[in-house]
Amino acid sequence: MNSIPEGRPTPNLPRTANKRGVARLAAVQALFQMDVAGTGVMEVVAEYEAFRLGKEVDGTQYLDADPQWFRAIVAGVVEDQLKLDPMIHQALTEDWPLSRLDSTLRAILRAGAWELKARKDVPTAVIVSEYVDIAKAFYTEDEPKLVNAVLDRLALVIRGESRGAKPRHKS
């Protein structure tokens, strides 16, 4: 994973994305910043809207994002985190508690879980695919597969539908 100077994760490869996709990526980066630096939700949203979304930062041009989508994800994850984390924990394998995951992976899973829960108007396949793509931008190993499996399990629990996952059974 690459980092920009402030320590925020940045994708490995540039890719085209729609405004909601860019908002999802920015939300993951903002959630990472909040987790690592202890930045508050109002501060991080204001920073991203004023200085990052659609702006040039340290020679890197940020793509235009849907600011309302960005705000909704960040604020929604913060508001629902106490409900989301136990759901994510249940969807992980028993030897991988949420606390063991790095901050970027936690941010991806929290944002994806929130969208599955709160944005019933967005198809499950779109949400899962978008967050798997975000994981692929940061990781080259098994993490994108983990994101796919966890979000698919959560979709089954939250929405009663999935892209093929089976619920995790405790032995």
Curated annotation (Swiss-Prot):
UniProt signal peptide: none
Cellular component aspect of the GO annotation: cytosol
Keywords of this entry: RNA-binding, Transcription, Transcription antitermination, Transcription regulation
Main function: Involved in transcription antitermination. Required for transcription of ribosomal RNA (rRNA) genes. Binds specifically to the boxA antiterminator sequence of the ribosomal RNA (rrn) operons.
Transmembrane segments: none
Family in the record: Belongs to the NusB family.
One BP annotation, GO: transcription antitermination
A molecular-function term among this protein's GO annotations: RNA binding
Name of the protein in question: Transcription antitermination protein NusB
Pfam families on file: NusB
SUPFAM superfamilies linked to this entry: NusB-like
Lineage: Bacteria, Pseudomonadati, Pseudomonadota, Alphaproteobacteria, Hyphomicrobiales
Keyword Hydrolase part of the UniProt annotation: no
